[in-house]
Amino acid sequence: MQQQQFDQLTTAEKREVERQLHLYMDGAEEVIPPEELRAKLAKSILTGEPLKIKLGLDPSAPDVHLGHTVVLNKLRQFQENGHIVQLLIGDFTGKIGDPTGKSAARKQLTDEEVRRNAETYFQQFGKVLDQNKVELHYNSKWLKRLTLEDVIELAGKITVARLMERDDFEERIAMQKPISLHEFFYPLMQGYDSVVLDSDIELGGTDQHFNVLMGRHFQEKYGKEKQVVILMPLLEGLDGIEKMSKSKNNYIGIDEDPHEMFGKTMSLPDSLMKKYIHLATDLEAEEKKRLVKDLETGAVHPRDAKMLLGKTIVNMYHGSKAAEAAEQQFKKVFQQNSAPDNITAVHWQGGGTVPVTDLLVTLELLPSKSEARRMIQNGGVKINGAKAESIHADIALEHGMIIQVGKRKFVKLQMHQ
């Protein structure tokens, strides 16, 4: 049947199928299975019906960072080719919490937390997707209506052995850590979402392999055509080791200040440059290849490639003017050893002298005195451009004093009597 549909297409239509197939598979870690993706594209062109592309979101951590955009950029490719984007907010499943990669049970969210996080998600996604061309769904709409009889029927369509194939469940059993019964229902409900939405394709990161395959499993059990699964690579964070995550503080948020975004990009390990060029930018494919080749041959210095990468990323989320300003400020601060033009003013009542560690903590430049001492000992604190040498120093406060912590944090003291 799949080949018959493809054979019915004109030569131009077949070329269009292959163009889209190449586009969607480019950069993907895995497509399950590729031949079904080709067949779905052929059917879409033959019937004129767009495909329905699902992305499920667990609204437990609503701040969107570059790691999320790897999947979002792929979703945008489908959107730009006329297909339907189904953004599924797991407001019901979010109360359970996805156990993927967790060595312990997760805290359940309240209705208000889920709603607030979902709104934040959608607002930030507008920087990547056309919000006017997105179907927004909340799975509480159908999951809340399930009766106990429905739930038992759903549970009867999968075995415990199949659910135990999850690596995280196996690890928790081996470590003698508890698994609550309700956690087994997360993949069941995620799979059932695909049944209700009748999704043709589901996107996810490679860490979602088990969950997104549940959609195929349950669609087949309910007599529907199985969705294709497209898994995108995970983007390592600024530490170059762990997956990008706000909780690990190794992230670049798409809502961050342009200067901070640019500075963080410049701190990337050289080893991540190629991956970020491929997955985190909107550069044309040929430009990506050329830049990567120049890096490999030494035709371009990693620092200069990072400057282009930083400017490209800031431009994507804040526009060209902000990107240009961020680049110029970075050059001024780090290459010319000057303070930035726009320094945050902090207010101080009174005057006199203050221990340097107290000053840094009071101004919330560092979270604790121990952190302040460590930063001073590592040469990371400057007062009016001069390095703070002693953790026991008393600082004579003055109006307009510039305090620098680390490479990118500057404040200017505003004195009030």
UniProtKB/Swiss-Prot annotation:
Gene Ontology MF: a single term: ATP binding
Residue ranges crossing the lipid bilayer per the database entry: none
Binding site for ATP: K246
Keyword annotations of the record: Aminoacyl-tRNA synthetase, ATP-binding, Cytoplasm, Ligase, Nucleotide-binding, Protein biosynthesis, RNA-binding
Keyword Cytoplasm tagged: yes
Chain ranges for the short sequence motif 'HIGH' region as given in the UniProt record: 59-68
GO BP terms, alphabetized: tyrosyl-tRNA aminoacylation
Residue positions of motif 'KMSKS' region: 243-247
EC numbers for this chain: 6.1.1.1
InterPro entries recorded: aa-tRNA-synth_I_CS, aa-tRNA-synth_Ic, Rossmann-like_a/b/a_fold, S4_RNA-bd, S4_RNA-bd_sf, SYY-like_C, Tyr-tRNA-ligase, Tyr-tRNA-ligase_bac-type
Primary site of residence: cytoplasm
Pfam family, one: tRNA-synt_1b
Gene Ontology CC annotation, any one: cytosol
Chemical reaction(s) catalysed: tRNA(Tyr) + L-tyrosine + ATP = L-tyrosyl-tRNA(Tyr) + AMP + diphosphate + H(+)
Compartment(s) of residence: Cytoplasm
Residue ranges annotated for the S4 RNA-binding domain, each copy included: 354-415
Xref: HAMAP family: Tyr_tRNA_synth_type2
PANTHER family: TYROSINE--TRNA LIGASE (PTHR11766:SF1), TYROSYL-TRNA SYNTHETASE (PTHR11766)
Similarity comment text for this entry: Belongs to the class-I aminoacyl-tRNA synthetase family. TyrS type 2 subfamily.
Protein role: Catalyzes the attachment of tyrosine to tRNA(Tyr) in a two-step reaction: tyrosine is first activated by ATP to form Tyr-AMP and then transferred to the acceptor end of tRNA(Tyr).
Subunit structure: Homodimer.
Protein name: Tyrosine--tRNA ligase 2
Source species: Bacillus licheniformis (strain ATCC 14580 / DSM 13 / JCM 2505 / CCUG 7422 / NBRC 12200 / NCIMB 9375 / NCTC 10341 / NRRL NRS-1264 / Gibson 46)
Gene designation: tyrS2
